[in-house]
Regions:
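DNA-recognition alpha helix
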Residues: 33-43, 68-71
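Short amphipathic recognition helices of helix-turn-helix/homeodomain-type DNA-binding modules
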Residues: 75-85
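A short, Lys/Arg-rich alpha-helix, primarily the initiator
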Residues: 2-37
């Protein structure tokens, strides 16, 4: 029972606003722009969770990075630059 509660707490950790949020604000890119630019399955909810700092798995982080790079051509961003966890 204690293990189950611990796992639940660990999966709900939020890391605060991520660098992704600041980058999207700087380039005036909305969540809808990211979803539209994505060639993979990506939802508004995934992007919003990424901006707010909810834990995402590495695959979703990569989808968001790919979509952000497709939405703007000025700079190429890596996962490490977009997320601080």
């Amino acid at each position: 029972m204690v293990e189950r509660v611990y796992i639940n707490i660990m999966t709900n950790i939020k890391y605060g606003f991520q660098p992704l949020d600041a980058i999207m604000t700087h380039f005036s890119i909305s969540n809808s722009d990211i979803v539209r630019a994505s060639t993979e399955q990506l939802t508004h909810k995934m992007v919003q969770k990424g901006r707010k700092g909810c834990r995402l798995n590495p695959h979703i982080k990569q989808k968001i990075a790919n979509a952000l790079n497709a939405a703007q051509k000025e700079q190429v961003f890596t996962i490490r630059e977009l997320f601080n966890y």
